[in-house]
């Protein structure tokens, strides 16, 4: 099955809230470019998705493609490509590839990983690796992460890679003491919510 959507905004007047004191060409345009979203679940396990956005002059502003496989035993494998064009004073360019996985290893244990490679600068922008244990009553996750912030220029002499160790404890029925890790995985791993719900409810 295939799902597709397209959208475009039209304005009746110039924007009153701007990034700078003086409106630029984007603040006075009467419409945006189109945005297109397409996804297809090829079978019970395999899904692909693509998104693209254009500016009103027809230039492509950004696009991405992702594919993920969800297994029947709680495993997930994900690859994707993301491109964003440089728009002065609006957005910086990037050209990146991502991959992630969730793999059960034994009983209630599973390992998870995510990597984000910067094609422009030929370096690993982010990688994350961790382990998760989940029982009927509680769950714990511990992860190590090495990354640059989205706005960091890794070639700048004063910019250094950041490193962190994160932990999350969840008591079933009470929620998590720290939900930042779950939010991070939701944003990084396509299909995480789907596979995580089936894992916790098994």
Predicted regions span which residues?
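Long, low-hydrophobicity, solvent-exposed regions enriched in small/turn-prone and acidic residues
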Residues: 1-202
